[in-house]
Amino acid sequence: MTDTIKIGVGGPVGAGKTQLIEKIVKRLAKDMSIGVITNDIYTKEDEKILVNSGVLPEDRIIGVETGGCPHTAIREDASMNFAAIDELKERNDDIELIFIESGGDNLAATFSPELVDFSIYIIDVAQGEKIPRKGGQGMIKSDFFVINKTDLAPYVGASLDRMAEDTKVFRGNRPFTFTNLKTDEGLDEVIQWIEQDVFLKGLA
């Protein structure tokens, strides 16, 4: 069975987690065997969105209904997600990469290191310029940080320069990028991180 890398994607409700995964998978799936696990509290809405997008066959997408606090299912008791990983591998024994999308949660949510190998945390500009200044373990500890919906900055009075400065304070040299996933702006940086830092490509 192929060794499988697992990337967790976390962030508040509406930040763009599902859309980010959809965009990444669309770019990588032609060269890589991929699966996706989504977490929702009482529905499988994000699973339906990905299935309807057509980026992957339906048997490569599993929706998990956590039935409780979203971060519990990705950290304190990740048993449902571990079971979903096993099921994806049974369905497709060639899977190289699995994305695990958390349910929308607060800035403190992080993935168990036993569940994922790497993590992405995404927020959006519309939540306010001050969000990076608030810190939060999701933003601080993630391997890659995404600030989405840059096109909304003028409408909410947010300075992207200030958000970048604040992000550098708590992340140091760890990577982050701005995105507008409606136009794919910034998506190349996310893909490059996956290919080079996660899969160690392009380092020869």
Swiss-Prot record:
GTP binds at residues 11-18. It is found in: Cytoplasm. Gene3D superfamilies: P-loop containing nucleotide triphosphate hydrolases. One of its GO terms (molecular function) is nickel cation binding. GO terms for biological process: urea catabolic process. Keywords: Chaperone, Cytoplasm, GTP-binding, Nickel insertion, Nucleotide-binding. GO terms for cellular component: cytoplasm. InterPro entries: CobW/HypB/UreG_nucleotide-bd (IPR003495), P-loop_NTPase (IPR027417), UreG (IPR004400). The keyword Secreted does not apply. Homodimer. UreD, UreF and UreG form a complex that acts as a GTP-hydrolysis-dependent molecular chaperone, activating the urease apoprotein by helping to assemble the nickel containing metallocenter of UreC. The UreE protein probably delivers the nickel. Facilitates the functional incorporation of the urease nickel metallocenter. This process requires GTP hydrolysis, probably effectuated by UreG. HAMAP family: UreG. Belongs to the SIMIBI class G3E GTPase family. UreG subfamily. This is Urease accessory protein UreG. It comes from Staphylococcus saprophyticus subsp. saprophyticus (strain ATCC 15305 / DSM 20229 / NCIMB 8711 / NCTC 7292 / S-41). The gene is ureG.
